[in-house]
Amino acid sequence: MSRESNDTIQSDTVRSSSKSDYFRIQLNNQDYYMSKPTFLDPSHGESLPLNQFSQVPNIRVFGALPTGHQVLCHVHGILPYMFIKYDGQITDTSTLRHQRCAQVHKTLEVKIRASFKRKKDDKHDLAGDKLGNLNFVADVSVVKGIPFYGYHVGWNLFYKISLLNPSCLSRISELIRDGKIFGKKFEIYESHIPYLLQWTADFNLFGCSWINVDRCYFRSPVLNSILDIDKLTINDDLQLLLDRFCDFKCNVLSRRDFPRVGNGLIEIDILPQFIKNREKLQHRDIHHDFLEKLGDISDIPVKPYVSSARDMINELTMQREELSLKEYKEPPETKRHVSGHQWQSSGEFEAFYKKAQHKTSTFDGQIPNFENFIDKNQKFSAINTPYEALPQLWPRLPQIEINNNSMQDKKNDDQVNASFTEYEICGVDNENEGVKGSNIKSRSYSWLPESIASPKDSTILLDHQTKYHNTINFSMDCAMTQNMASKRKLRSSVSANKTSLLSRKRKKVMAAGLRYGKRAFVYGEPPFGYQDILNKLEDEGFPKIDYKDPFFSNPVDLENKPYAYAGKRFEISSTHVSTRIPVQFGGETVSVYNKPTFDMFSSWKYALKPPTYDAVQKWYNKVPSMGNKKTESQISMHTPHSKFLYKFASDVSGKQKRKKSSVHDSLTHLTLEIHANTRSDKIPDPAIDEVSMIIWCLEEETFPLDLDIAYEGIMIVHKASEDSTFPTKIQHCINEIPVMFYESEFEMFEALTDLVLLLDPDILSGFEIHNFSWGYIIERCQKIHQFDIVRELARVKCQIKTKLSDTWGYAHSSGIMITGRHMINIWRALRSDVNLTQYTIESAAFNILHKRLPHFSFESLTNMWNAKKSTTELKTVLNYWLSRAQINIQLLRKQDYIARNIEQARLIGIDFHSVYYRGSQFKVESFLIRICKSESFILLSPGKKDVRKQKALECVPLVMEPESAFYKSPLIVLDFQSLYPSIMIGYNYCYSTMIGRVREINLTENNLGVSKFSLPRNILALLKNDVTIAPNGVVYAKTSVRKSTLSKMLTDILDVRVMIKKTMNEIGDDNTTLKRLLNNKQLALKLLANVTYGYTSASFSGRMPCSDLADSIVQTGRETLEKAIDIIEKDETWNAKVVYGDTDSLFVYLPGKTAIEAFSIGHAMAERVTQNNPKPIFLKFEKVYHPSILISKKRYVGFSYESPSQTLPIFDAKGIETVRRDGIPAQQKIIEKCIRLLFQTKDLSKIKKYLQNEFFKIQIGKVSAQDFCFAKEVKLGAYKSEKTAPAGAVVVKRRINEDHRAEPQYKERIPYLVVKGKQGQLLRERCVSPEEFLEGENLELDSEYYINKILIPPLDRLFNLIGINVGNWAQEIVKSKRASTTTTKVENITRVGTSATCCNCGEELTKICSLQLCDDCLEKRSTTTLSFLIKKLKRQKEYQTLKTVCRTCSYRYTSDAGIENDHIASKCNSYDCPVFYSRVKAERYLRDNQSVQREEALISLNDW
């Protein structure tokens, strides 16, 4: 199949469906507003039908049609609600229930009004019983449901309280919870679920997916005529859609009653009953009885349980068919050998359960059974479930008044040619629980003798371990294998005699089973071979392979004193021949015989010919170049390979233009940057500096309409009375990019609003939108023009909800909110996606896009813009900002930021903004409540006090303290795949299956998490064989009685993810577009599964936490790891030891094994442990480290191999300085280089030489300042005082004092360096920004601080583990007599100027000479002159080479290869570019003291 067809699979699939019967709206954005009821809204409830509603909420959906046209949809009749327990009896008549509802309704309305009343003469004050119009509570009714929090069977009755104002929901629930309404406290249910999430869950809607309505009402005019967008955007597809659904006699609303409020093309109104997505819900009433136990669920729909998961599976199946892939089959399941779950305290728990069972049972002799345990009261059938009760308050279908002012009547009953199908994200259809592993065949180990270590053996083992810790050997391998061998001997001694007798008997029996005769001869056993020797050595406790220990190749580096650290002594030797012990021949006679002078036979052969020139040339070309020596003045890179230069890999597909789909299902995106002329070196201030130019760029692939306009453009303020040739120059500079000129800034802003209204983008973005881009424009309009441009940019004219000072948004995403549009602050979006030391656009472009961007100061840009006579400078400014706008789109597209958030929204069900704005609990809840609602579960809403009062978390995951050491043999890494989700599935842990704490169970007042509940009598006796007791003592129902809701949710997630990943592997690398789409989906699934446990354990800000459930999950994970460790270490054939474990992973050391054996053993371990755990818990063999270093918890590094065929290792580090961002680049490079040298050579002499060389460079200043920049987050306003502020904040504060606009964003990374200062000066007072450092020629890096405080401590943490003290190596360095030539203090300049050394050869002067030359150099004048010239030319050449690099970089802006480009390139001050630092250094080399001295000497010598 061709690439084109692959890239448009989605659109092809959509077009293949039949003509749609639905009017479809993509749910891109939503909010709500309050209004007076219209005939499209409910006007009264059923509990108090005589009282009218004073106001009702309406939901606004900002979306798009399949044709790409924007639409605003008003949804009427959706009311927020919550539940409380019904205080009556099931035997109450319907009349009595209605009376109770009316009384509750009246009480609520009165008490809530009173709580809102602030003055005595408040107009809402009640007189008698006259309620009048209802302001807060719409209706109260009775529904039946199952409480979700705790194990409940049988229907419970609840009051459903429907409200009129969603913003009052939280306050009303607190009043009821605190007992201020009814005089007693009630538990609240589902009040923590936000209004908009409630409606999307009830109607089966998902963010960025389609709302299907069978009809709608249009507001007049049907097509908006503002800016003639109706004429510009109308096309055949839209006309066909309108012809089908728009009947001007029946469904066009009156302008008087329903005026247009939106600025978009189409505006419609719908009622709840029009939404057909709800019909796809699969409702399951299975928890009011033991239906799952009795097997009465054959006609009830099964998984996938969420429609988004179901749609995802259907879409994947269709895509596989389009790609001609085989039908998807679930991976084969590993055979399990799990009979029962025995925890450490299982015996104790069973005894407690029997006591609880006795305590909660009756003594009438009757044995309870599942068939008649629940009282099947027929009155429940007359009461609705929440699902059935939803339509009660829906407005009735109105008779629409004909709108005579509309366009001419039209009818067309033909179906529309839909070019799409529903594209929603999916779920799972398979019984594949959890991620499945590799298909390794099961190995039988039945031939191994079984032995159990006795307590005596354990004591001996402990003695061996104690002896090991006190040993003075360097290598652990021998001690570890000796320890394992002793355990084998002790365990095998019991069966030794039986084995020997059996072997003797077997020798007398032939292979056929007959006994040998008396005279029979039997072949003797062959002599032992190489493998027998290895096996014997292993049996005796010697490693099969004794890998080389670290050593010194240079014997001079060996110290006389022993190498010791932390009570251990390390035997480090040298491989040099001088350190070897000589062989003594004392007392022995050595005879030397003369060799015969002739040979009986002689043979001759031709010698190899010397290689030809071509052969040498070919060989040389094949050998990778080691590069030149110019980097000697910089910190050595950790690797010469170019693939390590970039932090993130290239994206080949990103360079290709993505093909538009015929169905619009993305979000349109407009980005913008501005240029403002400033004053001197100040940052532009919106209160002073006007915007001179606006550069906008529309992401072409997201814009579906063909408006015959460009996708990028420029707006410029230029008065016609000024330079008349300026517009012509601009147009000449920018070629085909459209440019518009405006007389004033205000006119340009008005044109910008018109542009936004015309394009109507869903997303507005800028690299930094608070101080620049949109934020600058908004602030400028407010302060100077008194013009609220935010209202003009919004998608509505009234009921506008905007925010300009959202504190949380300012610190985490965007502090600006524009109604109907999403705002993306690009640098902050990247901050959550990628780890960079700085988040400037130059750093992001280089690391993500692999593009180096020049940076000019605002002062330079202002000067170039004002120099209007220079075309090159104008062109530079225009291209500078235009490229930045283009980079904005490229960065988001490269990271798939928008596409990934869309996929999450479609899967989880929340809107696009909530994906990146809301936390993980909100996402879990969205998915969870959809399953709960389909099964009539009602969720508890605990208050903050309830959350604080629940039992504290007690269990912690297993995080072993590693045996810190250098491991020279293979180290296996095993990882449980999705451990916590798999535990919840495998052991059926959930809110809905919790019965209680086994030690405290009784019939009433069972404390569990944030709630208390009662148990029906005899329930424990009934469930005696259908419960699981978790290792923390909480009892859960098994799947035979009730499959947990969390299990259903996670099964959907994990199964679909497995299907997606398998499809990704099968489609290969050709179809990159589809692969990126699938990758975004699997990432969304992975993130959702990983945060589910956090939802249960959120003990501070939890929405529905349960500490007992969270402890069950954690403790089960802990004991699962402990069981795995026991299985691994008991198998004697592996000779393995677990040296580290962390939550869900194990590090297993194999002393003396080969890497190939390590892979084989690793797979066997993973399979064995998996077999001993319930489905779907799966232990995966991840990789082999060889060699490696374990430093401490969560800190380790090693050479990683993921397959036996892998030849080149991957440097894999976690938690150490090479991957941390709180240090400096030099620290990362030096430490990684040292670790690589240790792993590759184990030669400590090479490491010592390398380190001393780097330390020496630092001391003499022969380094790049960029490598020594710290970049730490700054949170101004979060520090107690200026005295406690960190160094970065001090640097920023100094900058703000000079320019108030220089204040950084919250958590922005600020670079700074540490320089030498006065004695006693504080560290933070010696910190300067890179700008200050480069401007101050008298500043010098504090080499002692960097070496002793930044470099040596982390190196010591690594090399102390092998007995090496790096600090001693640093002290051996002979410090340079000369100070740095580039960073010398003022007092040093004088000293160097009068130093008694020759400025040519460096020899000490015997007498003072004006030329600063020694007698020898004076005598050899020609040689000295030549030396000066060579040095001068070398410096000049280096400088010119660097200037050429800068000119090449800036050429993309100037398109000028002349002198002017050279001048512009010199203005670049990109502090993210290493060339900039090198250029500044080279420039200073040409004018430092030594260069001046040499120049003066050269002039004086010029007379020769």
Swiss-Prot record:
> Could you tell me which PANTHER family the record lists for this protein?
DNA POLYMERASE ZETA CATALYTIC SUBUNIT (PTHR45812:SF1)
Recorded catalytic reaction(s): these are:
DNA(n) + a 2'-deoxyribonucleoside 5'-triphosphate = DNA(n+1) + diphosphate
Question: Which positions are annotated as binding Zn(2+)?
Answer: 1398, 1401, 1414, 1417
Kindly provide the name given to this protein in its UniProt entry: DNA polymerase zeta catalytic subunit
Q: Which cofactor does it need?
A: [4Fe-4S] cluster
What is its biological role? Nonessential DNA polymerase. Required for DNA damage induced mutagenesis. Involved in DNA repair, mitochondrial DNA repair and translesion synthesis. Translesion synthesis in S.cerevisiae may use a specialized DNA polymerase that is not required for other DNA replicative processes. Has a role in the bypass of abasic (AP) sites. Highly inefficient in incorporating nucleotides opposite the AP site, but efficiently extends from nucleotides, particularly an A, inserted opposite the lesion.
Family (UniProt): Belongs to the DNA polymerase type-B family.
* One Pfam family of this chain: DNA_pol_B_exo1
| Span of zinc fingers (CysA-type) | 1398-1417
State whether it acts alone or in a complex, and with which partners, per the record. Answer: Forms DNA polymerase zeta with REV7.
What the record notes about the co-factor is: Binds 1 [4Fe-4S] cluster.
SUPFAM superfamilies cross-referenced by the UniProt entry? DNA/RNA polymerases, Ribonuclease H-like
Q: What is its subcellular localisation?
A: Mitochondrion; Nucleus
Q: Which gene encodes it?
A: REV3
Q: What is known of its domains?
A: The CysB motif binds 1 4Fe-4S cluster and is required for the formation of polymerase complexes.
Q: What positions does the record give for the motif labelled CysB motif? A: 1446-1473
GO biological process terms, alphabetically, are: DNA replication; double-strand break repair via homologous recombination; error-free translesion synthesis; error-prone translesion synthesis
The lineage's top-level taxon is Eukaryota
- Keyword terms of this UniProt record: 4Fe-4S, DNA damage, DNA repair, DNA replication, DNA-binding, DNA-directed DNA polymerase, Iron, Iron-sulfur, Metal-binding, Mitochondrion, Nucleotidyltransferase, Nucleus, Transferase, Zinc, Zinc-finger
Q: Could you give a GO molecular-function term held by this entry? A: zinc ion binding
Q: What is its EC number?
A: 2.7.7.7
Entry-linked PROSITE patterns: DNA_POLYMERASE_B (PS00116)
Enzyme class label: transferase
Which of this chain's residues are annotated to bind [4Fe-4S] cluster?
1446, 1449, 1468, 1473
Question: What is one term from the GO cellular component aspect held by the record?
Answer: zeta DNA polymerase complex
